[in-house]
Structure formats: C-alpha cells, structure tokens
C-alpha cells in the first residue's frame, strides 16, 4: 500500500468488491470499445487506476464504490482480472461522492449527448445548482449546459435513437430549431426512416417550414402550438426531464416522464424549490 501526493491511497482490491455508483450517468458501454481497451491494458498496462471510496458498516468495509473509471473496471473484468489497483479516496460524504462522480464523467469526452444531459440534470435537481454554477464546476459555458438540457424536450423516440447512436447531436439541433412540435415529430420520423445526414435534415427542416407557409412566426393560426412548444422546451430545460405540454379541450395538460421513486422525489424537490423567475428567464 502506498501514498499518493493527495494523501489518497493506492491499493489492490478484489474486482468483485467494486460496485458502480448510483450516480453514474453513463449507461452505454460498447463491447467493441471495451475490447480495444482490454487490448491496450494488456499491451501497456493500466495507466490510470479506477478511483473508489469505501462503503462501510461501522469498521467493516462492505464494498468499494466507483467514483471514476467504470469503463476501465469493465474492461478489466472482460480481461479476466481477479484483482485491480485502485485509488482510494479519503472519506467522502454521499453528496460529495455523487457530485465527484458526475463531474468526472462530464469532463470526459466519452459520454453520449443524453448521458451528458442527464449528468447536468442531476447536478441541478439533486444538488440544487443553477445552470451557471454547473457550468463553472465543469468548465463549460452556460449556453452549453442549457443546450444539452434542451435534449429532454425531444420526442421520446428520438431520445432512444440518440442513445443507440442512430441520431447524432447534430440531428437533434436541427430538430430543436423547429418551433412547432408537430413539425419536430415529422422531421424526427423522416430522419429515422430515411437515415438522413445532418445536412439533409437541415434541408428537410427548411422544406417543412416553407411547405405550407408554416413558419410559426408568420402563421397566426399556429401561435398556440408555438406557445405550447416554448413552454414544453422551457420546462424540460429547467427541470431536466422529458415533458409534454398538450391542449385537452379548454385545458392544458403538462406531463413529466420520470423513472422510479428516486427520480420522482428529485422532481418533486425541484418543483417546490424552483421559482417562476427561474423557469421563465
């Protein structure tokens, strides 16, 4: 066992004693990428050990929770390693460990766009940070954070296709450039069914807007749809969850889509702590 300059500890642990953080935003690990990493580890060794913290019950260590390096840990498992060197962080409270996990993942380039958006969302909802504070913590512009959060206003099918890599961030930006929700749905379906390139999607978006004189800013009959689209996008960006805003007779129905009790509690907290000014600005 040796000491690092930061006073964190370098040690060898059983690979089966390591667990994934519940705050890990990354959900997609491509097998081909892991195989390439396995080859690299076998060739040059493990240059950067995973970073963990201890989860204890009194004096007993129950397991080690990953703060950084899940991809490396998975590659080591695939390579058949039984033990693995890790950097053991000194005692971290749950909130500090969760924040460190999210920030470490954001600062890496291998998250897909929706995983990045999810990491930003958790920092905002779970830790009560503003978009400005999130941007400063992760070294990005506020506009970058806001643009990623806008992805939650995309149709659910588009989000699924983004997770699978069938639709890129470039495609998403083209879809979001349309103000009308119906046109977004039409363009999304066209991108998916025809496998349009980003440039082709841009041309199709222009055609849709011009096709029926449908520029929402010029067509007064489309103003209600434009207003609902604005509200939907603003709510999704502010709270970081997929949301729909649809007319039902004389009423407007706002629906949030969350998975599990933890997400529901986080949304409830966000709804009770967010001011109207934060939503509308």
Swiss-Prot record:
Induction: In infected human monocytes transcripts are present by day 1 post-infection and last for the 7 days of the experiment. In patients with confirmed synovial Chlamydia infections, 6/8 had transcripts. In infected human Hep-2 cells, transcripts are visible from 11-48 hours post-infection. This is Probable chromosome-partitioning protein ParB. Belongs to the ParB family. Involved in chromosome partition. Localize to both poles of the predivisional cell following completion of DNA replication. Binds to the DNA origin of replication. Disulfide bonds: none annotated. It comes from the Bacteria. SUPFAM superfamilies: ParB/Sulfiredoxin (SSF110849). It comes from Chlamydia trachomatis serovar D (strain ATCC VR-885 / DSM 19411 / UW-3/Cx). InterPro entries: Chromosome_partition/occlusion, Cro/C1-type_HTH, HTH_ParB/Spo0J, ParB/RepB/Spo0J, ParB/Sulfiredoxin_dom, ParB/Sulfiredoxin_sf. One of its GO terms (biological process) is chromosome segregation. The gene is parB. Pfam families: HTH_ParB, ParBc. Keywords: Chromosome partition, DNA-binding. One of its GO terms (molecular function) is DNA binding. One of its GO terms (cellular component) is chromosome.
